[in-house]
């Protein structure tokens, strides 16, 4: 099968808080992988910051409309994370000791609706154990507060060959 001609789309249809939510017990040599997906149209409409706890990780309903990764080891490869809108953390949230690799991904046209200072349109990492971003493009992500594109709290890893435009 040709993944370019036969795109696999995970579409939240503007009706879900997180199109993809990942948490799993961390074990040496084990990880979850998403490869070649388009993840789009996640849209949290909640103005409050309610949460659901899964495996000891709080998944906040207004954070990470496209992907929320909490306390798991995950590789996101060759994915497009696009057109997600959230109250506070637009497209991606990496949290609670998570270890994440983003490689050859496009993160574009995501936004946060919040006008507070605690928001980000693209990728927000706070409490992540390891975050690596390689060969990725971040473009046209919007936020009015802290970071339209990428916000990383603490030293969590490396970023190489990352293109940021119109954010």
Task: For each feature predicted by the language model, list its residue ranges.
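Residue-level signal for beta-strand positions within conserved beta-sheet cores that form or flank
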Residues: 6, 30, 88, 119, ...
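Right-handed parallel beta-helix
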Residues: 30-41, 73-85, 99-113, 129-142, ...
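Short, hydrophobic secondary-structure boundary micro-motifs
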Residues: 46-49, 115, 146
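Extracellular beta-strand-rich solenoid/capping regions of secreted or surface-exposed proteins
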Residues: 1-35, 40-72, 93-97, 125-128, ...
């Amino acid at each position: 099968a040709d993944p370019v001609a036969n795109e696999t789309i995970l579409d939240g249809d503007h009706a879900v808080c997180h199109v993809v939510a990942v948490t799993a017990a961390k074990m040496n040599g084990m990880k979850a992988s998403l490869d070649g997906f388009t993840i789009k149209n996640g849209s949290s409409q909640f103005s409050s910051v309610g949460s659901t706890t899964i495996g000891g990780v709080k998944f906040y309903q207004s954070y990470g409309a496209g992907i929320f990764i909490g306390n798991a080891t995950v590789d996101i490869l060759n994915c497009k994370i696009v057109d997600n809108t959230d109250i506070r953390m637009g497209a991606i949230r990496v949290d609670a000791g998570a270890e994440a690799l983003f490689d050859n991904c496009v993160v574009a046209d995501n936004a946060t609706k919040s006008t507070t200072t605690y928001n980000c349109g693209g990728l927000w990492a706070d409490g992540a154990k390891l975050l690596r971003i390689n060969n990725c493009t971040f473009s046209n992500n919007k936020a009015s507060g802290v970071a339209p594109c990428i916000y990383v709290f603490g030293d969590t890893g490396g970023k190489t060959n990352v293109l940021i435009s119109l954010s």
